[in-house]
């Protein structure tokens, strides 16, 4: 069985704002086990111990999603402070050089929380009036997706630097 893995910071508290749109417009749907999230590394290794060794250096932090932005084909919420996510992403990339983010498809990795992959006008109206959204990055999770199966949590890593 071939499986794909992702390391994400879940924001389950934002589900009431974005999950209806994500369910109708996104490839990785809530009903397939993918929570609202900011991706740290995809594809990712399944090396739980090595991931834990990287993430132990990072602590939880407050996150504000105050604006919407777009990539081609994707409407997303911008997390602030983005630099906190960027530092974790860079540490994971250094530790796992054989797993470039998004298989190296993008020159720059921009931390984001996907809201919709179509129906953009509806999504803007639905989400923009509820901004800013506040949450907390408290943990990262390693998710696994096997063929014809949903995403499932393999491991959880509390962000509590020691």
Predicted regions and their residues:
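A short, structured active-site edge motif that brings together acidic residues
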Residues: 65-71
């Amino acid at each position: 069985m071939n499986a794909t893995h992702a390391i994400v910071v879940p924001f389950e508290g934002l589900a009431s704002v974005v999950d209806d749109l994500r369910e109708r417009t996104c490839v990785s749907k809530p009903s397939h086990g993918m929570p609202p999230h900011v991706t740290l590394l995809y594809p990712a290794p399944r090396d739980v111990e090595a991931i834990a060794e990287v993430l132990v250096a990072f602590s939880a932090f407050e996150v504000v999603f105050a604006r919407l932005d777009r990539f081609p084909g994707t409407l997303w919420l911008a997390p602030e402070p983005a630099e906190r996510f960027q530092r974790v992403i860079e540490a994971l990339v250094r530790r796992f050089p054989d797993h470039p983010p998004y298989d190296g498809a993008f020159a720059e990795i921009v931390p984001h929380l996907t809201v919709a992959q179509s129906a953009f006008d509806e999504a803007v109206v639905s989400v923009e009036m509820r901004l800013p959204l506040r949450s907390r990055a408290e943990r990262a999770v390693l998710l696994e997706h096997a063929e014809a199966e949903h995403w499932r949590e393999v491991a959880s890593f509390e962000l509590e630097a020691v």
